[in-house]
């Protein structure tokens, strides 16, 4: 019999004080920010890498595709390692690999070497979601875990926002190799901070289990039989396709659709990211006060989908398009903490790392597929359809969220 957690109990040696919770949330958020920073260290340097290695845009794009494929596959596997050996050691190894990947990229003299660096970065990135969420679930009190998820999401957005600024600034004033060497300092510095505070993020003791059995006495792969787990995977896959379209082509589509300058279109994307961070902050409050996170997700994504379709209609002036991008980011951000609470409720006991690893591999899969799909739309000169399909994918995600909530509540009633 597989049981799920609606509220994972805190271990007795971790008192639920505000200071303890805030410390854990800050440390995990710091690590997650590094992960998202590394999502874009290569993309931010494409302008320099293209002439330096005489590469096509397809070859540059393949570097990112390989990064996310390695990260997605590794993420699913990392969840098993987290549950077997503990989240802290796995998190430390991932951060270390990110630093090594930047150093490897900085010394690359061939496309193959760049590919190796991208693969190392993907391996390092793969551990963060299963490790981060396991630590948050184990070390943060139930009353404040929604705020932990909120900060976790915001820190990721900050990493996304800072990477292009930092990498392009250093590469412009010095060299792209120096930019990568400077980027390597970040994970090694954060690793030192985490090591000095390692007691705060210590894992729960891993119970010995018979071969083929999870720590809780259930089969290691039993959680894969839960429909809610695969609905969560589908939710992340679908929403990540939409996110991939926004990240890769929203600015270009706005230029074509509204006739605005590239600078204003870039500002619209910035508005999306900043508003998303604000939405995550508000979403933490909403999630903490709600007992049905799937409904919060459904409402937020309904609004985001309608706004995306409105943006596609080009019935507002250019400044209105910027505002709509911000509104889409805000509503999508509100859904973030409730989304993570939804997964937490669906996760079987003692399988947190495995569930988050499999579920979040859907995010990397969607981010790998999204740019290919939306790139084809843009090659066909269909900027309006880009936003229409972003809305369609967000609407499709609603069905998976409602399905997860229904399955989780049914399982809870059956257990009762």
Place the predicted regions along the sequence by residue:
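Extracytoplasmic gate region of multi-pass secondary transporters
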Residues: 42-43, 228-273, 277
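Helix-loop-helix hairpin linking two adjacent transmembrane segments in secondary transporters
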Residues: 152-200
């Amino acid at each position: 019999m597989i049981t799920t957690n609606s509220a994972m109990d805190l271990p007795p040696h971790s008192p639920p004080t505000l200071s303890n919770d805030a410390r854990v949330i800050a440390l995990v958020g710091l690590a997650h920010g590094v992960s998202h920073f590394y999502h874009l260290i290569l993309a931010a340097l494409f302008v320099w890498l293209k002439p330096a290695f005489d590469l096509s845009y397809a070859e540059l794009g393949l570097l990112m595709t390989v990064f996310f494929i390695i990260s997605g596959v590794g993420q699913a596997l990392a969840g098993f390692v987290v549950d077997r050996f503990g989240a802290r050691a796995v998190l430390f190894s991932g951060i270390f690999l990110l630093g090594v990947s930047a150093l490897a990229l900085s010394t690359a003299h061939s496309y193959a070497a760049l590919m190796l660096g991208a693969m190392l970065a993907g391996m390092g990135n793969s551990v963060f979601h299963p490790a981060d969420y396991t630590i948050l679930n184990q070390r943060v009190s139930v009353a404040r875990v929604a705020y932990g998820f909120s900060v976790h999401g915001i820190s990721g957005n900050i990493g996304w926002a800072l990477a292009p600024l930092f990498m392009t600034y250093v590469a412009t004033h010095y060299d792209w190799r120096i930019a990568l060497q400077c980027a390597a300092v970040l994970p090694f510095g954060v690793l030192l901070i985490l090591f000095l505070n390692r007691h705060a993020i210590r894992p729960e003791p891993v119970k010995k289990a018979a071969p083929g059995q999870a720590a809780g006495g259930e089969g290691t792969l039993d959680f894969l039989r839960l429909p809610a787990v695969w609905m969560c995977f589908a939710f992340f896959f679908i929403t990540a396709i939409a996110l991939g379209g926004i990240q890769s082509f929203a600015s270009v589509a706005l230029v074509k659709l509204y006739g605005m300058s590239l600078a204003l279109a870039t500002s619209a994307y910035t508005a999306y990211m900043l508003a998303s961070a604000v939405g995550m902050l508000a979403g933490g409050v909403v999630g903490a006060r709600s007992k049905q996170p799937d409904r919060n997700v459904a409402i937020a994504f309904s609004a985001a989908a309608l706004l995306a379709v409105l943006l596609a209609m080009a019935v507002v002036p250019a400044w209105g398009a910027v505002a709509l991008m911000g509104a889409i980011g805000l509503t999508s951000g509100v859904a973030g903490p409730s989304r993570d609470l939804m997964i937490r409720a669906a996760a079987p006991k003692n399988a947190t790392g495995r569930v988050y690893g499999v579920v979040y591999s859907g995010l990397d899969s969607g981010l790998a597929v999204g740019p290919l799909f939306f790139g084809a739309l843009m090659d066909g000169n269909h900027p309006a359809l880009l936003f229409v399909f972003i809305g369609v994918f967000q609407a499709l995600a609603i069905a998976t969220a409602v399905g997860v909530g229904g399955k989780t509540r049914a399982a809870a009633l059956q257990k009762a």
